[in-house]
């Protein structure tokens, strides 16, 4: 516990909050170009082929970002929108690609949570 005199001389040191998504540089999303689209396997208890893309952002960073949902249309040189948000079982993946924005198509046949996957409402009139 510091004395009053020590606090007057030095003061309290501010705790600096470290960003969880530094490549976005204080922006909610960033545009980028896919440099590589591939699949990778998750950490130990899980097993799958997770779809990821290496993206060069307009901020100059090159990051690995996750492609959510079933099926995608991304290739090399696709323009994508990247948001923050890590994938717990993929080490080094701290970003998500926004579905339904720029070159990324929404998920086909999605009925629930459509806004998260960029899917338009299915026409209820057709039966």
From Swiss-Prot:
Q: Which CDD domains match?
A: Ribosomal_S12 (cd03368)
Classification via Gene3D superfamilies: Nucleic acid-binding proteins
InterPro entries given in the database record: NA-bd_OB-fold (IPR012340), Ribosomal_uS12 (IPR006032), Ribosomal_uS12_bac (IPR005679)
Q: Which PROSITE patterns match?
A: RIBOSOMAL_S12
Domain of life per record: Bacteria
Pfam annotation, one family: Ribosom_S12_S23
**Gene Ontology terms: cellular component:** small ribosomal subunit
Supply one GO BP term: translation
Name the Gene Ontology molecular function terms of this record: rRNA binding; structural constituent of ribosome; tRNA binding
Keywords attached to this entry: Methylation, Ribonucleoprotein, Ribosomal protein, RNA-binding, rRNA-binding, tRNA-binding
Q: Which family does it belong to?
A: Belongs to the universal ribosomal protein uS12 family.
What function does this protein fulfil?
A: With S4 and S5 plays an important role in translational accuracy.
Q: Which NCBIfam families does the UniProt record give?
A: rpsL_bact (TIGR00981)
State how it assembles.
Part of the 30S ribosomal subunit. Contacts proteins S8 and S17. May interact with IF1 in the 30S initiation complex.
Specify the protein name: Small ribosomal subunit protein uS12
Q: What taxonomic ancestry is recorded?
A: Bacteria, Pseudomonadati, Campylobacterota, Epsilonproteobacteria, Nautiliales
